[in-house]
Amino acid sequence: YSKFHVSLMKSWYGANATVENNWLYDHLPKLDIPNYDVLKMFDLMSQGKVNGYMCQGFNPIAALPDKNRVMGALAKLKWLVVMDPLATETSEFWHNVGPYNDVKSAEIQTEVIRLPTTCFAEEDGSLVNSSRWLQWHWKGADGPGEAQTDIRIMSELFLRLRKRYQAEGGKFPDPLLKLSWPYKIPDEPSPE
């Protein structure tokens, strides 16, 4: 895998990744256990070991087993960011709607931020799934209201974090500061 690793790190870090610094291998997070799958993450949330969660195009309350355990884990977070075109069970887990979601909203301290995204038909891009097919599609229409593409939201987040690290420093800013971002439109890179 050495050639793949070098190619990957050069694509992420450009000229900053060199043989002298081991292609910035130390910038990659290291696991203390063999696998952090989604069930393990929710277990860690339940234990209060995870402070925040970015949920992008995924509805864990509807997708994972034991809805009450998942909701309990989300309630222990300090913050939850949900990026989805629709309001989902996850983005509304804190909201009491009687028998459909009978929770004590006042006891849930998680700050929930919902960032409305466009759906697949409102952006250019590719689709891939477990059936092993890959399909390119072109944008069919603009997204509604303030909805933004996932690419724009994540790019804005990266650029703002990078700017803040440049101004204020931080514990280990290098992975963000040295990342290569050679796009013509930095805040909304084209998937082409």
Question: Model-derived features: where do they sit?
Answer:
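Non-catalytic alpha/beta scaffold blocks inside enzyme catalytic domains
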Residues: 1-191
